[in-house]
A protein has these predicted regions:
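Conserved alpha/beta-hydrolase
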Residues: 1-6
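Alpha/beta-hydrolase active-site loop
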Residues: 9-32
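Gly/Ala-rich beta-loop-alpha elbow adjacent to hydrolase catalytic centers
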Residues: 35-44
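Hydrolase active-site cap/lid region
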Residues: 50-97
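Short beta-strand/loop motif that positions the catalytic acidic residue
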Residues: 110-112, 117-119, 123
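Short alpha-helix in the alpha/beta-hydrolase fold that links the catalytic acid
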Residues: 113, 127-136
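Catalytic histidine neighborhood in serine/cysteine hydrolases
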Residues: 136-152
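Catalytic histidine-centered segment of alpha/beta-hydrolase-like enzymes
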Residues: 149-161
């Protein structure tokens, strides 16, 4: 991801995030499964919904709404209501699209593939309610809720890793298992 971790760049917007994921999916095609964490999970599902770039997706600690995440961030840094509105308007102007364009509820109709949602009940960064909303918006999605692992530790939890590996290892009924698994 640009401007993420050790990657080059000084800015990561939702549009750049999605473009990077879509380039990765195209380069690795065919992709059997995508595994995403946090905002990477939501942006991965958005990308797959618009490109058909994978046969199945595992979403770990995924927010259901970018706008709600922006509101949470604004509250965490102490912005007033007016400051929050200005912050969100600035982000939307910079990205060139309303934050609600990236909501999982809005893309649910474009997603017809196996989905695994994993979230910890004690996640303080992205509340578990977000995965409950995602499960409601994405009929047929399997929801696994853990306890006591928070936002990041669940990534290394043996039971979570096993559930994700088992999910990824399954063949999708309409397509042969081939290609790569892509972790975002």
């Amino acid at each position: 991801m640009p401007a993420h971790g050790e990657s080059a760049g000084d800015e990561l917007t939702a549009v750049k995030f999605i473009a990077a994921i879509e380039r990765t999916l195209a380069r690795l095609a065919p992709v059997h499964a995508v595994i995403g964490h946090s905002l990477g999970a939501a942006m991965s599902l958005y990308s797959v919904a618009h490109t058909g770039g994978a046969n199945r997706v595992a979403l770990i600690s995924a927010p259901s709404s970018l706008k709600r995440e922006l509101n949470r961030f604004a509250a965490a840094v102490g912005l007033s209501d007016r400051g929050t509105a200005a912050f969100i308007a600035s982000v939307e102007a910079h990205v060139g699209r309303p934050a609600t364009d990236f909501d999982i509820r809005g893309i649910a109709g474009k997603v017809d593939l196996p989905l695994l949602l994993v979230h910890d009940q004690n996640d303080r960064q992205v509340p578990v309610l977000e995965s409950a909303r995602n499960a409601h918006a994405l009929p047929g999605a399997e929801l696994m809720v853990t306890r006591g692992l928070g936002h990041n530790r669940l990534l290394a939890d043996p039971a979570v890793v096993r559930a994700v590996v088992d999910f990824v290892a399954q063949e999708t009924p309409t397509q042969e298992m081939m290609g790569s698994a892509c972790t975002i």
